[in-house]
């Protein structure tokens, strides 16, 4: 009987000591390059369709399924951080600056590109909520991918980007797991690449300076405040590359801050109590004035054409308007500039 108990005890101790414990080890590289070396990417877009994102898919990326070896119930998630300056945003995602002309959209996450988190700001953020391995050995990976963004209005050009540090991903143990002295952070640098950027736009066919002769009228034709009479008309014509949608902004040259629909008369005008409004085509609502800028979404910008028109034109009607301050006859002069945006 004594020998039986000794054998039983020995077997019990052997089984006990084979129970696994949560463990992690680093098997990746601390410094990693994103994208192919000397990559080259080409695209065509309208001049003012900015910011313009190059659809490179996942070609500019880094993906590694074997960065940490984990076992025995170890629980791990991932945090990511971008070190580049934020220069704008697109649909809630930060645009990070590389050069004056080129920026980046960045995604970080686990091994699967499609689950990457769109990065915003420069703080650590959760890019993979995590999981707990069972009583077996597995690995935790990660991925980073980017898309270049054209930031500024320019003619067709080639942009070269040098190798640039992007940021980092760190392993985040949780649920009682501990990394101890194991390497938890890996860094990423974007490999150099070239963008071959082709832009499309339009050419103005009518003179850049248009003089509209205003008809002479009597004060009796504008008896009440808000009354209008057609004073003159003109047309603007363009020749456009295929696919370009033209937008335009009128700016009050005398009072550039004017955002109303009444053009300020110049100092050379002698009439008072009268203003000028500008209408396009058959619209019943006058155009409002905005900043002298081709930026997409400029204040009081209006659509002149669709992307299917290669020879767009617009008819503009200038109307006198009684401003309600009492009309005194005289000369009427106004200056408005027009700025086109090719989107």
Swiss-Prot record:
Residues 23-199 are annotated as: Receptor-binding lectin domain. One of its GO terms (cellular component) is pilus. Belongs to the fimbrial protein family. The gene is f17fG. It is found in: Fimbrium. Residues 200-343 are annotated as: Fimbrillin-binding domain. One of its GO terms (biological process) is cell adhesion involved in single-species biofilm formation. Residues 298-307 have a biased composition (Polar residues). The keyword Transcription regulation does not apply. Keywords: Disulfide bond, Fimbrium, Lectin, Signal, Virulence. This is F17f-G fimbrial adhesin. Residues 287-307 are annotated as: Disordered. The keyword Disulfide bond applies. A carbohydrate binds at residues 65-66, 110-111, 138-141. It holds the Pfam family Fim-adh_lectin. Essential fimbrial adhesion factor that mediates binding to N-acetylglucosamine-containing receptors in the host intestinal microvilli, leading to colonization of the intestinal tissue, and diarrhea or septicemia. Also confers adhesiveness to laminin and basement membranes.
